[in-house]
């Protein structure tokens, strides 16, 4: 009930400076919680500023280092007093986001265009009862680098020109997407927003350093990197 989302953003920026590196965009930290407010849109900010117990926190963060860029989004849950684990409904919601990731990356085929992969992945996801948006971009010397695009958050029918490029091997991408999940306990939709660097090569697709499959727990004594 004290720390604000901006406090966290500026702590992260100061930490990056202390390490002698830099961000290539201003980080985002926002909150979803049980409330009667509408799901905020991509071009606006969550109305919540002060982080509370029981919040689902989303962070979008990327650094520049050794001429390359990262672009990552992860989710954390703020444990309530006495809690040791996140609610099952949020655990299940994250799994739906992972399912969209699997459907999408399983469709990576050399020579297929970004638009073809996007539309196939969206259809398969909707057929399985998921409600995704996919907006994945190349990653490398620039945060949004050269190469084929796989949708934009406001262009889910395909992206002219950049989405028409074929997928090539030995390329990297920020696997960026979300899926809406209705939470009966909160009586509202939430977005499971995920983004993680991945590589496509001779052996197919793989995540460069794994992906998030469990919520980060704020208030737990266990360090996330352990």
How would you label these PLM feature ranges?
Residues 1-226:
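Active-site neighborhoods and metal-handling regions in enzymes and metal-associated proteins
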